Amino acid sequence: MTSMETYQRADPLLGTALEGRYRVDAVIATGGMSTVYRGLDTRLDRPVALKVMDSRYSGDVQFLTRFQREAKAVARLKGDGLVAVYDQGGGAPGDEPPFLVMELVDGGTLRELLRERGPMPPHAVAAVLTPICKGLAVAHAAGLVHRDVKPENVLISDDGEVKIADFGLVRAVAEAGITSTSVILGTAAYLSPEQVGSGDSDPRSDVYAVGILAYELLTGRTPFTGDTALSVAYQRMDNDVPPPSSAIAGVPAQFDALIRRATDRDPAGRFADAAELGDALAEVIDELGLPAFRVPAPKQSAQHRAATAFHSGVLQDGSTDRHPNVGTADVRPPDPRRDTRVFTPDELPLPLEPLPDETEYQPATGQFAGIDLEHFHWARQRSKRVLAGWVVIVLILAGLLAMGAWTLGNNLPNLV
């Protein structure tokens, strides 16, 4: 029996209905703070994502108060680049564990895309960062700070939408005074110096994290490494983030400058918030004449595998009846106190269902920064700076030259 099959069958929440309404169908991923499930709102017949917090948070009044407050605040946010929050519940002593009901994004995470394809060319990086900045800008305008911007919290839909999730959870956990090594390991690479030094954070802390994320998208790695999460975190206290062009050839100077300002060790030197960062990014896109781009969802994502497991009838009792005796959950979830992980294709007991054909993609040849261009979708619109046909030819030639410099000048396997 595979570990995936064993886990799906052993999880006591599978097949139950949280608060008698939200059916728990399949595990998507598990981490230090929570387990994420594919589920169904049986009242509205709507697929949802269920983030069930670790059982150690149940009964913690301080955590539950903050958890409920943050959930209500995030649920009021509306805008592109944000994963919608529909409901929250649980957490009372003897009750179900605390949980969030969120929009189910059919696709995968930015982390999974990076693992599949490696570092991205500038136009793809811009396409990822633009909706992230828009989503964060909406939150910052409402007085909210994410505090945990990282590839695992960026979702990419099969339709090419990029959205950020998990607002407010870090603050709720921190104020509850409950920490774990796995939580620290999951965030250390993206923490701002002030978060490491004093624990303080504001919109500029999110800006710093986006700068680190931009560096990683361009180079395939984060700027600071170390043997422990603590050593990784403290490196940013005394060291500036190096320009990405020093790690991989072909990065435009405009991206070096953007990341340098976003990751200034002094918060006063950074962009004030995500809106200001987004405006600066738009100027870079315009100056470089970067084409619009449809971000591809990862092919082998945990979300896709969870959907396959559910639709194939893989349940804790091994039956083909997907929801026998669905009732309220009165059991605690499995203890997920370990590093966040998702299941690999080999762990799935049944073959993956084929994904829809990407007929809208326009095949091309070659690679750019380790990414097969044949998988990319180039929008059929010209850049505002393209005023005549000969400019298009110049841009194509420049892109081919950059592709050659990026591919030949780097040992891409070492960057993943």
Stretches with model-predicted labels:
Residues 1-302, 310, 314:
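Eukaryotic protein kinase
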Residues 1, 308-416:
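C-terminal or otherwise distal, non-catalytic regulatory regions appended to signaling enzyme catalytic cores
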